Amino acid sequence: MNKHHIMPPRDADPNRPSWMRLCAWSAFFATLPSGVWRVLMIVGFMPGTADFRTFQLAGEPTLGYVYVFGLSIVQVTCGYLAVGLIRPWGEHLGQWRIPARLPVFLGAVGSLALIWIFNVQMVAQVALGHRPDAGLIHNWALAVMLWCYLPILLWGPLTLATVWGYWQCRAHENSEAYPRGETSSP
């Protein structure tokens, strides 16, 4: 087989700048620590969080488990969608090319929502003395929780940067595809 005809792996990064790849993967990884912490807490594997676990499971425990597991799954899945902006599966569904405006719109709205939720609301609530754990976690267990939740502050800004890079790359690709002044929206 001639080495010049070898195709790159189907899941190889397309021609995206390294800063964009770093932002996309970092956005995804920013979702993992709090998601893992939350699951470990709810199943009782996180020492020092028994009171908070009891608080979370008060009322109907099944709903508490479903909520915590569901929230963690949705969070990590949404974080992984940023990776789609640098991968082929984020630009094509089978033979259909995804219009650039769709992921740009959804990504921008999602990023701004994340920034509002975590960087504005959560930080403001903590600054006003309202702790998300209702004051039930103390000492080193509180330090572990804080370290696991700090990366979530990067999720929105990193995703927004990735969305901007995606828009720029798709606009550049379209400008190369229409060299005679013809235009197509990215």
Which residues are covered by each model-predicted region?
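Perimembrane loop-to-helix junctions flanking transmembrane segments
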Residues: 48-64, 134-137
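C-terminal TM-helix exit segments that contain a strictly Trp-centered aromatic cap at the helix terminus
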Residues: 33-45, 112-128
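Cytosolic juxtamembrane helix at the C-terminal end of the final transmembrane segment
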Residues: 5, 9, 16, 86-94, ...
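Alpha-helical transmembrane segments and their helix-start/interface "positive-inside/aromatic belt" motifs
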Residues: 14-32, 100-110
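Hydrophobic cores of alpha-helical transmembrane segments in multi-pass inner/ER membrane proteins
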Residues: 2, 73-81, 147-163
